[in-house]
Every structure is written in structure tokens, then in C-alpha cells.
A protein has these predicted regions:
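A short acidic, Gly/Pro-enriched loop at the edge of an enzyme's catalytic core
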Residues: 107-117
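Short alpha-helix
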Residues: 165-180
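Conserved S-adenosyl-L-methionine
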Residues: 181-191
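Conserved small/polar residues in nucleotide/adenosyl-binding loops
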Residues: 193-195
Length: 195
């Protein structure tokens, strides 16, 4: 199969895939990712207490959040992508979870010192806004995709440009430390994806 034929096939696949939240079940069994050296869910569970008031930033459709089985009345989510926001309003709000829409470069729509724990898996964030909404002694747990991730995949798709080349662990650590955070754990992995 030529590169042009592959691109056409991938474009067709993209059009046929129905996305609801961050449910990627349509590619299950067709993509192999190297495991990460940490377990994000376990990291969250290590800090999540029954009385914790939590925020899940960029929750998608709440798939991960719901797997935590945390009391809904102590849970808030944000979502910026309109289809996912609408899904959250239909799926999460009726459960009693607070759902808020966010916009890039705007303050988080919550009062200062609102949360014991802020979660963020692959969503953008402003370190100072996270600090503002955390209660004193609160925790921010994040897992991000850095600017150097998937370079081979980008090249395969014909896009060799990195959108955010300076977004990496080293630079983000400086931002967190400058904002007054204490970093309890950090690691990075540049994993390979096989399609």
C-alpha cells in the first residue's frame, strides 16, 4: 500500500469513527502502546480520600472519572470541547456532578480554594489557576503528552512539526516550582505506538 493510499484509508477511518467522550473502543485491538512506567489511576487512588472534593479537568465523557467511584456530590468536571461538554451535561450532571465549560486562556470557573484534588489527564492547564482552585495542602495529579511524543507517528502522517516543542517535564517542573508547588512524583516516558 502506498503512502497516499494509507492517508486515504486513515482519513476514511477518521470519518467513520464515532467519538463519544474519550472512548476509543473503536480502535481497541488495532493499536499497541508500550506500557507507561506508572499507573495513573493508582496514583490518583493513592491521594483520593472519601471526603475529597475533586475536579477532573478535560474529563471527556467522564469515563476515567466514573471508574474512581467517588461521591458525585463532591465531584466537579470541566470540558472545553463542545461535543464532550454536551455529553457531560447529559451523562454526568444528572448524577449530581458539577459540569462546567472552560475556554482557553480563561480562569477556571470555580472559587479559590475549592478542591482537595485536581486531576488532569491530557488537558491543557494554567499552573497558577490550578494553584488558585486547590485548597491549601491539596494535590494536582496530571499525566500529559509532551512535545516530543509520537514524532514517528507525526512523520508517518506527513506532519513533522511539533505544536509545542517546549512542553516537556523539565520546563513544566520549573513552572510548578515557581508557582509554589512541591513536586512529590514526576516521571516521563516516550512510548512507541504501533498501528
Amino acid at each position: 500500500m502506498t503512502q497516499t493510499e494509507k492517508h486515504a484509508l486513515w482519513a476514511q477511518e477518521e470519518q467513520s469513527a464515532e467519538m463519544h467522550g474519550w472512548d476509543f473502543s473503536h480502535i481497541r485491538g488495532r493499536v499497541v502502546e508500550a506500557p507507561l512506567p506508572w499507573d495513573y489511576k493508582q496514583k490518583v487512588l493513592d491521594f483520593l480520600k472519601p471526603q475529597s472534593v475533586i475536579l477532573d479537568m478535560g474529563t471527556g465523557g467522564g469515563e476515567f472519572l466514573l471508574s474512581l467511584r467517588h461521591p458525585f456530590s463532591q465531584t466537579s468536571v470541566t470540558e472545553s470541547w463542545q461535543p464532550n461538554f454536551e455529553l457531560c451535561e447529559k451523562k454526568l450532571a444528572p448524577l449530581g456532578i458539577t459540569v462546567r465549560k472552560t475556554e482557553e486562556d480563561k480562569p477556571l470557573p470555580f472559587a479559590d480554594n475549592s478542591f482537595d484534588l485536581v486531576l488532569n489527564r491530557h488537558d491543557s492547564y494554567d499552573v497558577n489557576e490550578v494553584r488558585r482552585v486547590l485548597k491549601p495542602g491539596g494535590y494536582f495529579i496530571t499525566q500529559q503528552v509532551g512535545g516530543s511524543n509520537n514524532l514517528r507517528l507525526r512523520a508517518l502522517l506527513g506532519n513533522n512539526k511539533t505544536a509545542m516543542p517546549s512542553f516537556n517535564l523539565e520546563n513544566e517542573l520549573l513552572h510548578f516550582k515557581n508557582a509554589g508547588f512541591t513536586v512529590n512524583f514526576c516521571d516521563q516516558a516516550l512510548s512507541l505506538i504501533h498501528i
